[in-house]
Amino acid sequence: RRVLFRSAMTSGHVYVAQVAIGANPAQTLKALREAESYDGPSLIIAYAPCINHGLKAGMNRSMVEMKKAVRAGYWNLMRFDPRLAEAGKNPLQIDSAKPNEDYQSFLKGEVRYASLTMKNPAHAAMLYEESEKSAKDRYDSLIQKRNSLEPKEGLAK
């Protein structure tokens, strides 16, 4: 799923959005409307907690969990609209703020991750660190990609 957005975006002719309705309902609705109106292939990738995630707070708190996922940097909200490039604008819109919540606390809020800590604490700590670094690197890469797509003056189509 993490490569899916970038792969679709790289083709240059696919509308693609990554959403989480609990984190930002307006962004989700905007993405759905844009995808529907796009005259070409559209792809919406949605973060949706399920019972297998083992939310410690309970499934009735899944909307809150989506916010945590975005705020921690586990899931980024973004849209890529090829029409914007044709209009001389940046086609990549990042709709989530820079992560500002504890990433590992987010992971530990789900049994699917927290159970590893009980079985092998040292290995879990290493994997949590790697996952957090990967999330930070993904966000930095996303910012770099957005910056690289900024239209250059005088080059608008």
Enumerate the language-model features and the residues they cover.
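Glycine/aspartate-rich loop-and-adjacent alpha/beta segment that forms the canonical ThDP
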Residues: 30-126, 130, 143-144, 157
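Short, small-residue-biased leader/transition segments that mark boundaries at the very start
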Residues: 3-4
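Gly-rich Lys/Arg/Thr-decorated short loops/hinges at beta-loop-alpha junctions or inter-strand turns
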Residues: 9-14, 109
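Short, amphipathic C-terminal "tail helix"
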Residues: 133-157
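Short catalytic-loop micro-motif centered on adjacent basic/acidic residues
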Residues: 15-20
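Active-site glycine- and acidic-residue-rich loops that bind
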Residues: 21-29
